[in-house]
Swiss-Prot record:
GO terms for cellular component: cytosolic large ribosomal subunit. SUPFAM superfamilies: L28p-like. It holds the Pfam family Ribosomal_L28. Belongs to the bacterial ribosomal protein bL28 family. It comes from Herminiimonas arsenicoxydans. One of its GO terms (biological process) is translation. Gene3D superfamilies: Ribosomal protein L28/L24. Keywords: Ribonucleoprotein, Ribosomal protein. InterPro entries: Ribosomal_bL28 (IPR026569), Ribosomal_bL28/bL31-like_sf (IPR034704), Ribosomal_bL28_bact-type (IPR001383), Ribosomal_bL28_sf (IPR037147). It comes from the Bacteria. One of its GO terms (molecular function) is structural constituent of ribosome. This is Large ribosomal subunit protein bL28.
Amino acid sequence: MARVCQVTGKGPMVGNNVSHANNKTKRRFLPNLQNRRIFVESENRWVSLRLSNAGLRVIDKIGIDAVLVDMRARGEKV
């Protein structure tokens, strides 16, 4: 699935552009996705992930091993 964080599941949101005259038109708010290669010491290999900034913070907080266990439990291929 495109434009979705593999760690947090964050995807695009829908909202409005609001002009000075208060006219509203639909727009999409896209997550801040980055492609990152992260080294997993326990598996001695690199893992490529498409992450939002929040996903990077989750990895910093709980560690890549815990994140990979959670992703595999959801059935995501890593």
